[in-house]
A protein has these predicted regions:
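Short, intrinsically disordered, mixed-charge
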Residues: 43-57, 140
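Short glycine/proline-enriched, acidic/aromatic patches that form the donor-sugar handling elements
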Residues: 24
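Extended catalytic/binding region for NAD+/ADP-ribose chemistry, centered on the ART fold
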Residues: 27-47, 121-126
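Active-site and NAD+-binding cores of ADP-ribose-processing enzymes
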Residues: 2-17, 29-30, 57-150
């Protein structure tokens, strides 16, 4: 399976999940390492933009094309999430926390809060299969500055 990670270039080689551990994310609480990836490059960009504002200058971003074993993916179906889940971050964090702490799979496929019909992937970097994560390509991705003026 091929998925994508968009990150500031200075962290392009870091698959430790330390950023999410420090700041937390939609699917993980502060203190618990996780990696976030997307099924599409465009969704990766949207996930960056949703946290940006018009006063942020776009940093240098790198796009990582990553290969994962398909047999290491658990999924959460959109219909199984409670109504309004996008607005209940403690709810989604508890799901991700349970996934990471149970340590039964490397990857959790989750709906995107921005485009629920598309998916992000939460990776548990502490899982024994994390060594199977293969970075295929790392390339500089220059985001159109107009995206940050919205």
């Amino acid at each position: 399976m091929i998925i994508y990670r968009l990150t500031t270039s200075k962290f392009s080689g870091d698959l430790s999940g330390e950023g999410a551990k420090i700041y937390g994310g939609r699917w993980n609480p502060v203190g618990l390492a996780a990696l976030y990836l997307s099924e599409f490059i465009s969704l990766s960009i949207l996930e960056i933009l949703v946290r940006a504002n018009k006063y942020n200058s776009p940093d240098s971003y790198s796009l990582l094309t990553i290969q994962l074993p398909e047999d290491s993916v658990n999924s959460i179906e959109l219909k199984k999430l409670k109504t309004g889940w996008q607005n209940h971050i403690e709810y989604t964090r508890s799901i991700g926390e349970d996934f990471i702490r149970m340590n039964q799979a490397l990857v959790l496929k989750v709906p995107s809060a921005i485009v629920p019909q598309e998916h992000n992937y939460l990776i548990n970097p502490a899982h024994k299969d994390s060594k199977k994560i293969k970075i295929i390509v790392v390339e500089l991705l220059e985001l159109d500055k107009r995206l940050f003026q919205i």
